[in-house]
C-alpha cells in the first residue's frame, strides 16, 4: 500500500506531462505537421521522466538534467527542419517540440499550474500569432529600403535545370531574397526563359552588376534581362 502511495505522484506527473504535450501536439496534428500529437506527448513525457529520475538519484540538482534536456531536444528538432530551395520549413514545429520538453520539465517538477499556463501560452502563439504573421507578410515592402526586381535569363531547354541551380547559388551569394522562380518557353524554338522575382536594397546597382557578371560566366545562358518590378 505504501509503495502504491509513493508511485501515485510519479504517475500523476507523467500523466500531466503526456496530456499537456498531447494538447500542444493536437494543434500541430490538426495542421498536418510532421511532429504531431504523439510526438509532442512523448517529448513532454520523456522530459518528465528524466526530471523525475534525476530527482530520485540527485534531488539537489534537477536543473542539471533540465539543461541536458534543452540541448538534447535540439537534435530531435533538427530532424523536422527541411529546406526546399530558398525556403525553410519546420522551424515552428521544432520550436514547439522544444516547448513541449519544457512543459515536461515543469510537470516532472510538479509545477502543474505553471505547466498549464505555459501550455495555454504556447497554443496561443501557434494559433493566434499565425494569422498575425500572415497579415504582416502581406504588408507592402518599404519603397525606401527595398525594391522588387525581375531577372530573366534565356537558355537551351536541356540546360534549364542546371541554370536554375546556378541562379539559386548566385542569388544566395548576392544576399538577395528570392520571391519566385519560374520558366516559360522563349520566343526561339528549343529555348526556355527563366524568370526570377527578387527583393533587395533600393541601391541595386552593385547587386545587379554582381549577378549579371556571374551569370555572364555561364555559357549556357544566351540572354539576360534585368528590370524593376513596378507593381
Swiss-Prot record:
Disruption phenotype: Not required for Mg(2+) influx by MgtB. Gene3D superfamilies: 3.30.70.260. The keyword Flavoprotein does not apply. The chain crosses the membrane at residues 5-25, 39-59, 62-82, 103-123. It comes from the Bacteria. InterPro entries: MgtC-like_C, MgtC/SapB/SrpB/YhiD_fam, MgtC_SapB_SrpB_YhiD_N. Keywords: Cell inner membrane, Cell membrane, Membrane, Transmembrane, Transmembrane helix, Virulence. It is a multi-pass membrane protein. GO terms for cellular component: plasma membrane. It is found in: Cell inner membrane. Induction: Part of the mgtC/mgtB operon. Induced by low extracellular levels of Mg(2+). Transcriptionally regulated by extracellular magnesium via the two-component regulatory system PhoQ/PhoP. Belongs to the MgtC/SapB family. Virulence factor required for growth in low Mg(2+) medium and for intramacrophage survival. May be involved in regulating membrane potential by activating Na(+)/K(+)-ATPase. This is Protein MgtC. It comes from Salmonella typhimurium (strain LT2 / SGSC1412 / ATCC 700720). The gene is mgtC.
Amino acid at each position: 500500500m505504501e509503495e502504491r502511495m509513493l508511485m501515485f505522484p510519479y504517475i500523476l506527473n507523467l500523466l500531466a506531462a503526456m496530456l499537456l504535450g498531447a494538447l500542444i501536439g493536437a494543434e500541430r496534428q490538426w495542421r498536418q505537421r510532421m511532429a504531431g500529437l504523439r510526438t509532442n506527448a512523448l517529448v513532454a513525457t520523456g522530459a518528465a521522466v528524466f526530471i523525475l529520475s534525476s530527482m530520485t538519484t540527485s534531488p539537489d540538482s534537477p536543473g542539471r538534467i533540465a539543461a541536458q534536456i534543452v540541448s538534447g531536444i535540439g537534435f530531435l528538432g533538427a530532424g523536422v527542419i527541411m529546406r526546399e530551395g530558398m525556403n525553410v520549413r519546420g522551424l515552428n514545429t521544432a520550436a514547439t517540440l522544444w516547448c513541449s520538453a519544457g512543459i515536461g520539465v515543469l510537470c516532472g517538477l510538479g509545477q502543474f499550474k505553471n505547466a498549464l499556463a505555459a501550455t495555454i501560452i504556447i497554443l496561443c502563439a501557434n494559433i493566434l500569432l499565425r494569422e498575425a504573421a500572415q497579415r504582416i507578410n502581406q504588408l507592402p515592402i518599404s519603397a525606401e529600403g527595398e525594391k522588387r526586381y525581375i531577372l530573366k535569363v534565356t537558355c537551351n531547354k536541356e540546360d534549364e535545370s542546371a541554370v536554375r541551380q546556378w541562379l539559386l547559388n548566385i542569388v544566395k551569394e548576392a544576399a538577395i531574397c528570392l520571391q519566385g522562380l519560374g520558366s516559360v518557353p522563349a520566343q526561339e524554338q528549343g529555348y526556355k526563359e527563366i524568370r526570377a522575382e527578387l527583393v533587395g536594397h533600393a541601391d541595386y546597382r552593385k547587386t545587379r552588376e554582381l549577378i549579371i557578371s556571374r551569370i555572364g560566366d555561364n555559357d549556357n545562358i544566351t540572354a539576360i534581362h534585368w528590370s524593376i518590378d513596378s507593381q
